[in-house]
Amino acid sequence: MIDRYKHQQLRIGSVSPQQISAWAKKILPNGEIVGEVTKPYTFHYKTNKPEKDGLFCERIFGPIKSGICACGNYRVIGDEKEDPKFCEQCGVEFVDSRVRRYQMGYIKLACPVTHVWYLKRLPSYIANLLDKPLRELEGLVYCDFSFARPIAKKPTFLRLRGSFEYEIQSWKYSIPLFFTTQGFDTFRNREISTGAGAIREQLADLDLRIITAYSLVEWKELGEEGPTGNEWEDRKIGRRKDFLVRRMELAKHFIRTNVEPEWMVLCLLPVLPPELRPIIQIDGGKLMSSDINELYRRVIYRNNTLTDLLTTSRSTPGESVMCQEKLVQEAVDTLLDNGIRGQPMRDGHNKVYKSFSDVIEGKEGRFRETLLGKRVDYSGRSVIVVGPSLSLHRCGLPREIAIELFQTFVIRGLIRQHLASNIGVAKSKIREREPIVWEILQKVIQGHPVLLNRAPTLHRLGIQAFQPILVEGCAICLHPLVRKGFNADFDGDQMAVHVPLSLEAQAEARLLMFSHMNLLSPAIGDPISVPTQDMLMGLYVLTIGNRRGICANRYNPRNRRNYQNERIDDNNYRYTKEKEPYFCSSYDALGAYRQKRINLDSPLWLRWRLDQRVIASREVPIEVQYESLGTYHEIYGHYLIVRSVKKEILCIYIRTTVGHISFYREIEEAIQGFCRACSYGT
């Protein structure tokens, strides 16, 4: 449907019998009205043509081949000169065969049938509106018992009988005789109501505004009473208040959407278009049919049997009619939702039939797989991995995926730079992966964002924009801070990448969807780009260091081996294999790590600026080492102080690791960047 703003939308809800009839009925040019499916047949076993008034009837749903009727005659579609527009012999219109994808039919039910979604799904809408237990309504719907009291607002035999203050002795003999007379059928239809018809009458008598008002009054009265002191009674009152709130919300929803409650009971059953429940011929001449066709056949068989019983009601016992009504109700329940009442219906191979609910719901349903999960151009999919060196707004795009996504842009670049004379030559260069192709691709992606999406997209942050960079391999690299917004894990999750083509889409991606502009949760406002499991584990490994203390290094058995220590002299640092190295700056330490001279967790001594907290420390040195020139080293647990002969502090070294240095530098750069941003803002 299209709303007043010309937005296409799909809404699922209850519709009136008149609307179902308008969807399915159509008037042929000769004035004949078709649309009702009355026969449970599909194709004739000899001619392989659809049966008339069956589940694949061409009069109801349109021709199988465009412009060809059931008789084999052909007419040009859309030619106004061709007259008539339908075959007078078979009644099939000369229209496009695609009409069989949306033309519906209907089954006129011999008795009202409740929609199982509104009765059995929790919460039960019918039970909430009628304010009755679900078990009682189920017994009424499936004809397990009847209402032995008047349903309609009119004087009845049972109502008059209950108004007398005394019993007439003769009634003990007259009433049993009355039940055995021929007029009992009239009495039964008037005084006793059962099945979905009784539910429909009760729903039709409801006034939704009165229900809302009475429920609100009762809710206020329960709220004014206060706690009773009895835990069981308080819980009962709480459940009643919750029920009243749900009932008011449901009644308001019906009023707001102009839906009548009695529409939850079906009188006309829609029949899906044939192309949505096809019968396909496979190798060997065998036919494969949708399970919905078999469920429709079951409904039509039982409905036709009930119709025959009702036409011969004088000679048919009432119990037989009620039993057949129950079978019709169960058949419709199985069609709509197989297994909702317990044991699902199975075929001859013990395979469960797929009902209408099974077709549309779930990951492989019609909506998520076919309508929402369509394959689109300029998109790809791959596994995500951590990209720790990436900026927050960047993502690593594999080269092979990027060359496919941006192939048209690369072709345009090759032609504009006169590196290819036409599209064919440009595609040939791309297939051969010439070096110039990667240069042009690098220029293209610099100004073109991409969208990353992880299904299911449950909120706005499920799809975000990134600036791509080319990476090797086949996996998409992602900054770990954006993981929480996607609700993704780096354990094999896949994400889809899309290329926004129009200028409007690219502007929206840059202004609204970039990851560094979505740092807060749109739902509660809390920070969503926070360190999570992967980053915390990485920081732990980065800063864990070597657990051995400074004392343990002196008595390490490895130090007792007799071999000459290799000493490496440099202007920036002094390093020996057996002793912990000394560095003058963090850049020297990181350079030694890149040259693989030290490990990430290897302890080292780093020259540090004077710190008053260190000088004022009352810690007793573990060891004091004197040199020949009179200077000496005071060695503490995590730092050492070099003093002169006059006990002046010459320099300070702290005991740390390369991991700690890297972590400290990242924090320092972040603080400096924040301070610069604040200074620019002021």
From Swiss-Prot:
Cofactor(s) annotated in UniProt: Mg(2+); Zn(2+)
Cellular component annotations (GO), alphabetically ordered: chloroplast; DNA-directed RNA polymerase complex; mitochondrion
GO molecular function (one): DNA binding
Entry keyword Metal-binding: yes
Subcellular location(s) of the protein: Plastid, Chloroplast
Enzyme kind, highest EC tier: transferase
EC number, UniProt record: 2.7.7.6
Family matches, as InterPro entries: DNA-dir_RpoC_beta_prime (IPR045867), RNA_pol_asu (IPR000722), RNA_pol_N (IPR006592), RNA_pol_Rpb1_1 (IPR007080), RNA_pol_Rpb1_3_sf (IPR042102), RNA_pol_Rpb1_clamp_domain (IPR044893), RNApol_RpoC1 (IPR034678)
Record keywords: Chloroplast, DNA-directed RNA polymerase, Magnesium, Metal-binding, Nucleotidyltransferase, Plastid, Transcription, Transferase, Zinc
GO biological process, one term: DNA-templated transcription
Pfam families: RNA_pol_Rpb1_1, RNA_pol_Rpb1_2
Cofactor stoichiometry and binding remark: Binds 1 Mg(2+) ion per subunit.
The UniProt record lists the keyword Secreted: no
Reactions the enzyme catalyzes: RNA(n) + a ribonucleoside 5'-triphosphate = RNA(n+1) + diphosphate
Binding positions (Mg(2+)): D489, D491, D493
Coiled coil regions in record: none
Binding site for Zn(2+): C69, C71, C87, C90
Annotated S-S bridges: none
Subunit relationships: In plastids the minimal PEP RNA polymerase catalytic core is composed of four subunits: alpha, beta, beta', and beta''. When a (nuclear-encoded) sigma factor is associated with the core the holoenzyme is formed, which can initiate transcription.
Purpose of the protein: DNA-dependent RNA polymerase catalyzes the transcription of DNA into RNA using the four ribonucleoside triphosphates as substrates.
Similarity comment text for this entry: Belongs to the RNA polymerase beta' chain family. RpoC1 subfamily.
Name of the protein described by the UniProt record: DNA-directed RNA polymerase subunit beta'
Organism: Platanus occidentalis
